[in-house]
């Protein structure tokens, strides 16, 4: 073994041991970091845990003052470990059932419109009629099932059959999934056209409504769908996503809304609109009024009509779908865009000036008040705290601007118990404090104070920004651990340690086949692939592919070290971590 490799293995061992230590301090470390940072910025620190989640920023001040005030309002707002004495699950269910009650009222109002004596349409009714014509023109009268099938897939989450631990698509192909009664014909048609041995465990008339953590004030309600329903829902969502490109709406790109939020903060000509409980307030009646009959039938065939609550109660949904449904995001984007574009046309504004990303909506400021009126009529509630149409502040898709200045805050979401947790917070602080390329001198002492809590070897290991948060961000030229080999520079990073878990061989091959048809069959469907799994070694007969791995890696709650190639230049803040080929040194 070469000296270089021996040295690297020795260093990896030291870094690994340091990464798996615990950070032990008195009190709440996350709150201490936030308060020290606010004090350094000459902003009032938090007086209590309740104070962390109940403040609003101050307007009418300079961009720098607003940026600091806004950081105070946001930094701990998503922290999930405060002990506030709030039953977060009960709060979530109360909100969920309230949204259902609102949808019931909306259904009654839209199915039985109350026209006046002169039979004049309200603004909301007029927008519904215009939006329907726009949607029919965009989607077409019939559903393109071949296109839908190309987008169908299993997600990586839980289903009513598979827990999250077995959420990988290969497990879902291996284990027959449930579906609702009206979705059975779709599964049968899929089985007939693909030659794949697909099965249904049972026909389930409902999904499972559950809660997941959100913050210290409330949980979030989602629905776990039957597996086959989710499979086809994602197909419908994929087609709608493609169709929206005709309106210059790209649901794969958040930067469109982010750039327009910047523009709105400079010119005041664009408004950013956000909705409360958007996915839980899309009523059945609204979808039936807006979508062509064929599309509405498919959506209702593939949705879960009823849901089971944790206490065993069965409810009949008044909404079309909820978070957890595979087409909710695309459907809500379509509806919001259609209504906003129709309103702009009525007001003689450019419909093309509307962009949406889920419930993040941007349109001309002159149309914002009218849009709020239209949304109220069709059952949507505008989030007043996150809707801006007049003034210097705009926020959309995670970017926040004040008079054209980037004031995007960072968030401390969880307890800090490991070096990896602290590195994440310190890197967020670094990016926030160096947004203009140099350190804010007020913040640097706070950064160095808490950096000392890290083991010495982790304090010295730095990587350029853009490669994730597996090490402190900084200039790689100052790292004593970077290896230079010709044109390649390698640096060590902390990653979650994973352990291989064997998955079903047949499910692995079925998943591989399905993935291949999605990549290679742009226009030809059905895909009549074949699969042969022998009793001894199992070989996929599709083309000349290598044998498929039948193992899947799961985190084991510890950390490991990987060496990755990187550039010596510092990338822009918030860069994406692109995983390079690197070997994990055992």
UniProtKB/Swiss-Prot annotation:
InterPro entries: DNA/RNA_pol_sf (IPR043502), RNA-dir_Rpol_cat_phage (IPR007096), RNArep_beta (IPR005093). Residues 259-391 form the RdRp catalytic domain. It catalyses: RNA(n) + a ribonucleoside 5'-triphosphate = RNA(n+1) + diphosphate. Its EC number is 2.7.7.48. Pfam families: RNA_replicase_B. PROSITE patterns: RDRP_PHAGE. Its cofactor is Mg(2+). GO terms for biological process: viral RNA genome replication. SUPFAM superfamilies: DNA/RNA polymerases. It is an enzyme of class 2 (transferase). One of its GO terms (molecular function) is nucleotide binding. The keyword RNA-binding applies. Mg(2+) 1 binds at residues 274, 359-360. Mg(2+) 2 binds at residues 274, 359-360. Keywords: Magnesium, Metal-binding, Nucleotide-binding, Nucleotidyltransferase, RNA-binding, RNA-directed RNA polymerase, Transferase, Viral RNA replication. Binds 2 Mg(2+) per subunit, Ca(2+) is used in crystallization to prevent RNA polymerase activity. This is the catalytic subunit of the viral RNA-dependent RNA polymerase complex. This complex is involved in viral RNA replication that produces (+)-stranded genomes via a complementary, (-)-stranded intermediate. Binds RNA cooperatively with the host ribosomal protein S1. Homodimer; the replicase complex can dimerize. Part of the viral RNA-dependent RNA polymerase complex, the other subunits are the host ribosomal protein S1, EF-Tu and EF-Ts. S1 is needed for the initiation of genomic RNA (+)-strand replication. This is RNA-directed RNA polymerase subunit beta.
């Amino acid at each position: 073994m070469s000296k270089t490799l021996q040295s690297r293995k020795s260093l990896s061992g030291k870094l690994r041991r340091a990464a798996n230590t615990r950070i032990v301090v008195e009190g709440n470390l996350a709150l201490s970091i936030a308060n020290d940072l606010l004090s350094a910025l000459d902003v009032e620190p938090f007086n209590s845990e309740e104070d962390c989640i109940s403040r609003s920023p101050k307007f009418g001040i300079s961009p720098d003052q607003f940026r600091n005030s806004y950081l105070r309002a946001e930094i701990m707002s998503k922290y999930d470990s405060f002990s506030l004495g709030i039953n977060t699950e009960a709060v979530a269910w109360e909100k969920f059932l309230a949204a259902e009650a609102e949808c019931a009222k909306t259904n009654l109002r839209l199915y039985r419109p109350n026209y006046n004596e002169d039979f004049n349409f309200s603004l909301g009714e007029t927008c519904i009629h215009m939006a329907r014509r726009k949607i029919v023109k965009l989607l077409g009268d019939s559903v393109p099932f071949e296109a839908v099938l190309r987008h169908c897939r299993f997600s990586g989450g839980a289903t009513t059959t598979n827990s999250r631990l077995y959420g990988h698509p290969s497990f879902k192909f291996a284990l027959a999934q449930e579906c609702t009664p009206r979705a059975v014909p779709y599964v049968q048609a899929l089985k007939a056209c693909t030659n794949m041995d697909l099965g249904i465990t049972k026909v389930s008339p409902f999904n499972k409504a559950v809660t997941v953590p959100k913050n210290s004030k409330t949980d979030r309600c989602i629905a776990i769908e039957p597996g086959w329903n989710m499979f086809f829902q994602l197909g419908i969502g994929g087609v709608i996503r493609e169709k929206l490109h005709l309106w210059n709406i790209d649901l794969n790109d958040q930067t469109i809304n982010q750039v327009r939020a910047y523009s709105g903060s400079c010119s005041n000509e664009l408004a950013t609109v956000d909705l409360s409980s958007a996915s839980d307030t899309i009523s059945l009646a609204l979808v039936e009024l807006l979508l062509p009959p064929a599309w509405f039938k498919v959506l209702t065939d593939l949705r879960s009509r009823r849901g089971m609550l944790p206490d065993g109660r069965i409810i009949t949904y008044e909404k079309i779908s909820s978070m957890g449904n595979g087409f909710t995001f695309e459907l809500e984007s379509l509806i919001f865009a259609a209504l906003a574009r129709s309103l702009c046309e009525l007001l003689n504004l450019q419909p093309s000036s509307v962009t949406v990303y889920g419930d993040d909506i941007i349109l001309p400021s002159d149309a914002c008040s009218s849009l709020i009126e239209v949304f109220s009529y069709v059952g949507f509630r505008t989030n007043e705290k996150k809707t801006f149409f007049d003034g210097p502040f705009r926020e959309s898709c995670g970017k926040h601007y004040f008079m054209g200045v980037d004031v995007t805050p960072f968030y401390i979401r969880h307890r800090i118990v490991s070096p990896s947790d602290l590195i994440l917070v310190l890197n967020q602080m670094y990016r926030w404090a160096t947004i203009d390329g140099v350190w804010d001198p007020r913040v640097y002492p706070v950064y160095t104070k808490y950096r000392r809590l890290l083991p010495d070897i982790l304090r010295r290991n730095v990587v350029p920004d853009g490669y994730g948060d597996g090490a402190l961000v900084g200039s790689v030229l100052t790292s004593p651990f970077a290896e230079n080999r010709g044109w390649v520079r390698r640096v060590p990073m902390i990653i979650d340690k994973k352990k291989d878990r064997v998955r079903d061989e047949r499910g692995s091959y079925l998943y591989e086949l399905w993935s291949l048809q999605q990549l290679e069959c742009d226009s030809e469907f059905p895909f009549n692939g074949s699969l042969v799994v022998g009793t001894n070694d199992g070989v996929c007969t599709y083309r000349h592919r290598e044998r498929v791995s039948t193992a899947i890696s799961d985190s084991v709650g510890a950390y490991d070290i990987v060496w990755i190639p990187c550039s010596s230049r510092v990338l822009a803040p918030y860069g994406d971590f692109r995983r390079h080929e690197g070997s994990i040194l055992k």
